Amino acid sequence: MRAILLGPQRRPTLDAVVRPLFPSGPAGPFATVTAGWQEREPDDGELSALLGGRVVKLELYRRWLDVQERDPEYATAERALQEMLAELQDLYLLRLDYALRAVYALQRRAGTDRLGGTLTERVASPVAEAVAAVRELDAAHLGHVNEVRGEFFARLQPHDRPVIASHRASVADILGGASALVVAGGHVGVLADVLHLFNVAAALQSTALPFMTGRSPVIAWSAGAMALADRIVLFHDRSPHGPGHPEVYGSGLSITRDVVLLPHARARLRLDDTLRMAVFAQRFAPARCVLLEAGTRLEFSGDGGFPSGTRVLAEDGHVTSPAAA
């Protein structure tokens, strides 16, 4: 499936990206997702203008609110699910903090150790082992999250619930006539939840939809791009409360695989701290940690290759290109 990922759109580039994709104009409207804006979902006038006014809104947040109102059994169960996931995340973060403190302590030891032997013999192996322990923790947490979500959907059977089934059919019908799907940013957790609930990935993969021709793309930026990945990682080194540990949040739509997407990387990450960035990259290898900065345009076709101009965190902690990494 063709995915075009953009940098943040505070200074929009969307119109310039879309124009050459459809030189004769799109055959159908652009299906848009602004659910990440939550209550501001309808405030999409600028987005519509950038797309030439040819938009049809999926209104996934409004649909989710409708499910909350008209299917109280599902709404109650979903609230319980969110409480369980929040508890899982808290326990994971507690363990992650101790695990990463050990990694960073071993890194510092590498710079001060006066004992004999090579650096590799004395320090590199313990650091690698400590990073491996963090990787195991990340993988176990993602597995637990997916297991809990899977059990929830198996028990609640959304496809058999009339309100949800009706919305899913409506979303699939809209996508069937769209020239492209455009996913804006916002709250990545909300985006991922509603994209899963209304079965957007399955609709995109349907052979009845034009997206399978390879000509019609999914276009996304910021949190919208993160929600397309197989693994969503939250990160912020410059929060008011001090640097936070990059944390695995859950699974996205898996339209893009083996990438960890990092919008606003320069603003949110201490890219000059190569030791910290090295741990970041090593934690998620062989997936590439891809920077999505203002002006970025990356096109993924599902062949496993990386577009020209991709900027990634290398395992030595430097920002580079895949060819050089």
Regions found by a protein language model. Give the residues of each.
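Short, charged beta->alpha transition segments
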Residues: 166-174
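An anion/phosphate-binding loop that grips the pyrophosphate of nucleotide cofactors and donors
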Residues: 178
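Long, low-complexity, polar/charged, intrinsically disordered or flexibly structured peripheral segments
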Residues: 109-162
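Short amphipathic alpha-helical segments and helix-helix/interface helices
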Residues: 18-19, 171-172, 201-209, 277-281
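Short, flexible loop segments at the rims of nucleotide/cofactor-binding pockets, characterized by
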Residues: 8-10, 157-162, 191-196, 238
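Class I SAM-dependent methyltransferase SAM-binding "motif I" and its flanking Rossmann-like core
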Residues: 174, 184-187, 192-271
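C-terminal and late-domain segments of enzyme folds
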Residues: 1-122, 126, 232-234, 238-325
